[in-house]
A protein has these predicted regions:
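Gly/Thr-rich phosphate-binding beta-strand-loop-beta motif of the actin/hexokinase/Hsp70
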Residues: 1-22, 55-58, 152-193, 198-201
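Short, intrinsically disordered, charge-balanced linker/junction segments flanking boundaries
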Residues: 1-4, 81, 222-227
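Switch/connector loops and helix/strand junctions flanking conserved nucleotide-binding motifs
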Residues: 2, 29-30, 64-68
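N-terminal phosphate-binding loop and adjacent alpha-helix
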Residues: 15-46, 79, 223-224
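Phosphate/pyrophosphate-binding loops at sites that engage ATP/ADP/AMP, CoA/4′-phosphopantetheine
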Residues: 41-54, 133, 204
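Active-site neighborhood for divalent-cation/phosphate handling
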Residues: 54, 58-153
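Small-residue helix-packing motif on alpha-helices
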Residues: 79, 204-205, 209-212
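Adenine-nucleotide phosphate-binding core of ATP-dependent small-molecule kinases
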Residues: 209-227
Length: 227
């Protein structure tokens, strides 16, 4: 999916256009996923007339290491040094092999930071796909964090606890918010797993199972839902 935003005179983001393209999530075609993505992004860029625009995109939470760390009371000038030390302790790869960043969490009772990291070669592959589509990279975000920022931008700080469930093809992101605190977890289960289960149960192809799921699937809204 690609969306085009513009900044209003008041500084708010305004959605100008949006489009999406389907990618086959068949595990048997996993080797072609990068090429599928490149073609899809290129087609979207052409339809939305993006030219050689710089884009901001989000990476699946499953592909990124995320860790929340508490920081002791320190001077603001020493925060980056301390977070770097924490990253060295928690990131499961040498820092010279990853691209990483952090963000301080506003409003927490204790000073807290969220650290995100991705292997450099993995990010290069994703950037390569974007660049080969004729676009350039402005910023890279992590899907759960982008979801959090989008929710806060639209609804502000929730008064009650909120759980957002973002179900993708291969990965689902869980985002739990309580006051100013939030917690994320990415699990390697998504819509493709349901499609694969249908294909196995009825002895049909993945593509046929996907069609059946979309055409005939029903969502169970639970006993508490009033028709």
């Amino acid at each position: 999916s690609v969306a085009v935003f513009e900044t209003s005179k008041g500084g708010d983001l305004v959605l100008k256009s949006y489009d999406s393209e389907s990618i086959v999530a068949d595990p048997a075609l996993e080797a072609s996923r990068i090429s599928q993505s490149r073609i899809a992004i290129g087609d979207l860029a052409q339809r939305l007339k993006l030219g050689k625009s710089k884009v901001r995109y989000a990476i699946s939470g499953q592909a990124v290491f995320t860790r929340f760390v508490k920081l002791p009371p320190i001077q603001a000038d020493n925060v980056e040094q301390l977070v770097t030390f924490e990253a060295q302790q928690h990131v499961p790869f040498p820092l010279e092999e990853v691209v990483w960043d952090y963000e301080l969490i506003d409003g927490a009772a204790e000073k807290e930071a969220v650290i995100v990291a991705i292997k450099g070669d993995a990010l290069d592959e994703i950037n390569g796909t974007v660049n080969e589509s004729g676009l350039a990279t402005a910023e890279v975000d992590v899907a759960p964090m982008a979801l959090y920022n989008a929710f806060r931008a639209a609804y502000g700080q929730p008064e009650e606890s909120v759980l957002l469930v973002d179900i993708g093809a291969k990965t689902s992101n869980l985002l739990y918010m309580e006051g100013t605190r939030f917690f994320t977890r990415s699990v390697p289960v998504g819509g493709a797993a349901i499609t694969a289960a249908i294909a196995k149960e009825y002895h049909i192809s993945f593509l046929d199972a996907e069609h059946q799921k979309i055409s005939n699937g029903l969502v169970g809204l639970g006993a508490g839902y009033d028709q």
